[in-house]
UniProtKB/Swiss-Prot annotation:
Family per similarity comment: Belongs to the RNase HII family.
CDD domains, A to Z: RNase_HII_archaea_like
Cofactor: Mn(2+); Mg(2+)
Record domain RNase H type-2: where: 3-198
Catalyses which reaction(s): Endonucleolytic cleavage to 5'-phosphomonoester
Binding site for a divalent metal cation: 9-10, 104
Protein name per Swiss-Prot or TrEMBL: Ribonuclease HII
The keyword Cytoplasm is annotated on this UniProt entry: yes
GO molecular function: manganese ion binding; RNA binding; RNA-DNA hybrid ribonuclease activity
Organism of derivation: Pyrobaculum arsenaticum (strain DSM 13514 / JCM 11321 / PZ6)
């Protein structure tokens, strides 16, 4: 009997603007490798979109979760961002059952995140740094990035151009200082945001 394998990854952990998106893909390693899945950061936006369509067509299960800034703020203020990611990863695992899951770990101690997720779900979990070497994780990274990019584009139409959304981006900092800031799209708990208003 063939082992079913799932991969989980996220997009948007670092920006001060917009949501965090986690995604899961359950599918055949060889088939995913053949279509060219790899770390979403190494692909152009167009290549990601093309692969996203192919992943949806061929995977056994694909799903994602959107974590809004207010929920991120709530958990960051208590030092529990990794716990928040674990909670959403567990929900995705319920939606896409598999025999084994590979997860790109947000924790500096990859095994700690994997052990926690395994304990929470009762499933077999292997947590890795650079997890995109596993085709299912690479596919999940593409799904998460495409979904987040689309949400960010919608946000830009609503609130104006805020640059990359990263605190190192001058355009993002100027937009934050500009005052027309809907609370719900900014991660106020980020230290760099607090410094701007001191």
């Amino acid at each position: 009997m063939t082992l079913s394998v799932g991969g989980i990854d996220e997009a948007g952990r670092g920006p001060v603007v917009g949501p965090l998106v986690l995604a899961i893909v359950v599918g055949d390693s060889e088939a995913l490798s053949k279509i060219g899945v790899r770390d979403s950061k190494s692909l152009s936006p167009r290549a990601r979109e093309v692969l996203y369509g192919k992943i949806l067509e061929m995977a056994v299960c694909v799903n994602y979760a959107v974590v809004e800034p207010y929920e991120i703020d709530l958990h960051v203020s208590r030092g529990m961002l990794n716990a928040l990611e674990m909670k959403y990863a567990a929900k995705l695992m319920e939606l896409c059952p598999a025999d084994l899951y590979y997860v790109d770990s947000p924790d500096v101690k990859a095994a700690r995140f994997g052990d926690g997720l395994s304990f929470l779900t009762g499933r077999r979990v292997v947590s890795l740094h650079k997890g995109e070497a596993v085709p299912q994780v690479a596919a999940a990274s593409i799904v998460a990035k495409v979904v987040r990019d689309r949400l960010v584009e919608m946000l830009r139409k609503e609130v104006g151009d805020f640059g990359s959304g990263y605190p190192s981006d001058r355009k993002t900092r100027e937009w934050l200082r500009g005052g027309r800031i809907p609370h719900e799209c900014v991660r106020w708990s980020w230290e760099t945001v607090g410094k701007l208003f001191k």
